[in-house]
């Protein structure tokens, strides 16, 4: 943007910007007001009346302000002289801002708006929600069109969109026009590249449509994961810079109009703001992934940015302490790759950080109401909201990015739901908002229907799909990628030690809300009695429980019925909440035979990845969420020890595969988990619509060891 020549205009622009900023202190936020919801439309109309018209009071105020401008003119001129050396920076900034000229919304620029997805989707008069009440939008969503297609970089997807909304993914060249050319050039030339990488280009084609995206098949730590992060970071920064550019242009327009109303013959819509400043919310599970995201974000700051305030502090606080070594990385060959990639570096899960972006600087650790981007963990954000009783800073989020949602499933999913429920709510306070410049759809409470949500995970789950359905209502449409089972759809049975007998028992789950009770009933009345009747499975049995709530229920049941289960029955239990001494005692007692059964949660395996020895029978209360955990657990007797008690030998002696067995409980509602383990074809047969009642599927060893996973037989006996 070119600097305003008249110093009075310069000061007026500054004053206009200041008036649009929240005026709250940087201290503790006030408690949430329980007063009736304000009529924001009435407030906005009143503010607009003050702007329009040339009343005598307004004229006197303008003259008084002009006197103050004259007094400050000399000071401003001195400051402008000191900025002579910044001519090159100013020129770059002008070029950077001019690249966003399509953002301007005037009656004569409708064709430009149509070409710019940002203006068409987030503009003040967007046709996506104009003229429709919230109830109508919600009712229409139930009737959205649905279909399947194949997208570059995403593979097969399910798309959902309102009738009449065109959300087709455009070609690369056309899609990149939606982004600032300076950012595209950075993407093209960073790391010595000469063109936009294919993965980033494919993702930008999708993101530029402003649709919601659920992508449940990105492998943590992979090159693809990093490329997706880079594309999303550029997309988010482009949104922040376009928003800022429009506001600055309108500030200049209003400043000129205030001094000389006749200078603006062309009408201009200056409704460019929202209730609060933050526009991008980025949720990650640990500080290590937050650090990676911020490194991508700052790489796409404007070329005029000469300072990133508190960035060294951010890097220090989100990395390991100085001088500390990462023992997990040093012993990477002892752990699966996904475990190392997830837990290397700083894995604190309670953090939040505001990032403010201005023309010449960026600031880390900005107060939320002054930030453009909020980076946080679900737990960290929830802690802040509950402490201050304030979530208004989430009222104007326009881009939501949630990374590693599979990890959040292993933390506390309720924290994610807590944050999602508070997005785009009508604020309790005005926070210094200039209502004359607030976009109408904010005042109408329709922001949730325009927010773009980008959800990334390494696997699919009912929880993710439910969140995508209930919390994402983007009127530009929604895309959900369809993941394939591992090994090209064949699952992971080929990784299980050969000769190990596997029994998959399907129970009738009833309705969704009945499934937990049905599973518990099936286990306690059929599975457990069968185990106790056998001389083999009545001891050295490991029970793997994916859900912590099911784990607690089983543990209480076994404790309560200890005497009824047999005089020699005993068990130990370890979960993600067990401390190291408790874990060591339980592992030692189970291995030495002092405890017949060992209960373990999937979260314990996720966080610790210990190899538990002594088991000959493996019972899965439900299929594990992570498919690789199935062959990992069944390989415990054959793998080298890790973090073992000092008394334990290096392996289970004289292990014969024929002595081992696995029992898996599942229902039709476990189809996503079953598919990842046994493969798509067998999962459809085991969990399909015609798979009703109780059935048992037994995997029997094949004679030819060279046969591949797709040839593994699952024979059915109807129960």
Residues covered by each model-derived region:
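Acidic, serine/threonine-rich intrinsically disordered low-complexity regions
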Residues: 1-22, 28-161
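Conserved Walker A/P-loop ATP-binding site and its immediately adjacent core
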Residues: 225-233, 253-263, 269, 273-340, ...
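Conserved interdomain hinge at the start of the Helicase C-terminal
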Residues: 231, 235-244, 248, 265-272, ...
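Conserved two-lobed SF2 helicase motor
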Residues: 353-357, 368-385, 590-607
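Conserved helicase ATPase core of P-loop NTP-dependent helicases/translocases
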Residues: 364-366, 542, 552-559, 565-607
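SF2 helicase catalytic motif II
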Residues: 371-383, 388-434, 616-625
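A short beta-strand element within the Helicase C-terminal
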Residues: 398, 599, 610-622, 661-663
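A conserved SF2-helicase RecA2
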Residues: 460-477, 613, 625-719
């Amino acid at each position: 943007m070119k600097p305003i020549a008249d110093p009075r205009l310069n000061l007026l622009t500054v004053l206009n910007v200041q008036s649009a900023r929240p005026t709250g202190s940087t201290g503790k936020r006030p408690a949430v007001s329980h007063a009736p919801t304000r009529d924001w439309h009435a407030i906005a109309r009143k503010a607009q009346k003050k702007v329009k018209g040339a009343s005598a009071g307004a004229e006197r105020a303008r003259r008084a302000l002009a006197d103050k401008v004259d007094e400050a003119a000399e000071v401003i001129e001195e400051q402008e002289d000191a900025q002579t050396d910044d001519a090159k920076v100013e020129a770059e900034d002008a070029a950077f801002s001019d690249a966003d000229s399509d953002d301007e919304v005037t009656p004569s620029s409708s064709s430009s708006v149509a070409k710019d997805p940002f203006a068409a989707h987030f503009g003040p008069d967007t046709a996506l929600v104009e003229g429709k009440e919230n109830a109508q939008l919600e009712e229409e969503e139930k009737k959205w069109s649905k279909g399947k297609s194949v997208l570059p970089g995403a593979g097969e997807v399910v798309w959902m969109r309102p009738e009449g909304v065109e959300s087709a993914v455009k070609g690369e060249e056309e899609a990149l026009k939606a982004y600032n050319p300076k950012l595209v050039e950075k993407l093209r030339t960073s790391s010595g590249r000469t063109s936009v990488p294919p993965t980033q280009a494919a993702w930008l084609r999708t993101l530029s449509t402003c649709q919601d995206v659920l992508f449940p098949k990105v492998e943590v730590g992979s090159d693809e994961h990093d490329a997706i992060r880079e594309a999303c970071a550029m997309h988010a920064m482009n949104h922040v810079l376009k928003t800022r550019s429009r506001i600055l242009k309108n500030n200049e327009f209003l400043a000129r109009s205030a001094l000389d109303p006749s200078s603006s013959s062309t009408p201009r819509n200056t409704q460019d703001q929202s209730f609060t400043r933050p526009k991008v919310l980025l949720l990650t599970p640990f500080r290590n992934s937050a650090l990676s995201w911020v490194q991508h974000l700052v790489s796409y700051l404007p070329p005029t940015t000469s300072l990133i305030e508190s960035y060294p502090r951010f890097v220090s606080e989100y990395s390991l302490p100085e001088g500390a070594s990462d023992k997990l990385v040093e012993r990477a060959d002892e752990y699966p790759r996904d475990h190392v990639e997830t837990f290397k570096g700083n894995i604190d899960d309670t953090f939040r950080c505001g990032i403010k972006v201005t023309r010449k600087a960026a600031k880390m650790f900005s107060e939320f109401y002054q930030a453009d981007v909020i980076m946080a963990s679900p737990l960290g954000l929830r802690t802040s909201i509950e402490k201050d009783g304030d979530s208004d800073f989430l009222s104007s989020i326009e881009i939501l990015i949630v990374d590693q949602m599979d990890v959040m499933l292993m933390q506390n999913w309720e924290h994610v739901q807590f944050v999602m429920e508070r997005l785009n709510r009508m604020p309790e306070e005005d926070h210094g908002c200039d209502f004359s410049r607030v976009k109408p759809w904010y005042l109408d409470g329709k922001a949730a229907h325009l927010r773009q949500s980008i959800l990334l995970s390494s696997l699919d789950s009912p929880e993710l799909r439910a969140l995508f359905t209930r919390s994402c209502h983007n009127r530009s449409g929604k895309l959900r990628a369809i993941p394939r089972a591992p090994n090209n759809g064949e699952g992971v049975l080929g990784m299980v030690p050969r000769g190990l007998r596997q029994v998959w028992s399907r129970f009738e789950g009833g309705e969704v809300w009945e499934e937990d009770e049905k599973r518990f009933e099936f286990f306690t009345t059929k599975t457990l009695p069968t185990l106790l009747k056998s001389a083999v499975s009545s001891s050295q049995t490991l029970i793997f429980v994916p859900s912590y709530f099911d784990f607690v229920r089983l543990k209480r049941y076994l404790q309560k019925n200890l005497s009824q289960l047999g005089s020699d029955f005993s068990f130990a239990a370890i979960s993600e909440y067990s401390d190291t001494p408790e874990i060591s005692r339980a592992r030692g007692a189970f291995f030495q035979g002092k405890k017949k059964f060992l209960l373990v949660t999937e979260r314990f395996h996720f966080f610790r990845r210990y190899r538990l020895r002594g088991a000959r029978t493996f019972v899965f209360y439900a299929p594990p969420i992570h498919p690789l955990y199935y062959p990992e657990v069944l390989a415990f007797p054959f793998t080298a020890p890790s973090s073992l008690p000092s008394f334990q030998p290096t392996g289970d002696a004289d292990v014969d595969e024929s002595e081992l067995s696995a029992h898996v409980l599942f229902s039709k509602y476990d189809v996503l988990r079953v598919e990842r383990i046994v493969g798509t074809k067998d999962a459809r047969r085991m969990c399909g619509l015609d798979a009703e009642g109780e059935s048992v599927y037994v995997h029997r060893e094949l004679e030819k060891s060279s046969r591949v996973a797709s040839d593994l037989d699952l024979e059915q006996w109807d129960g």
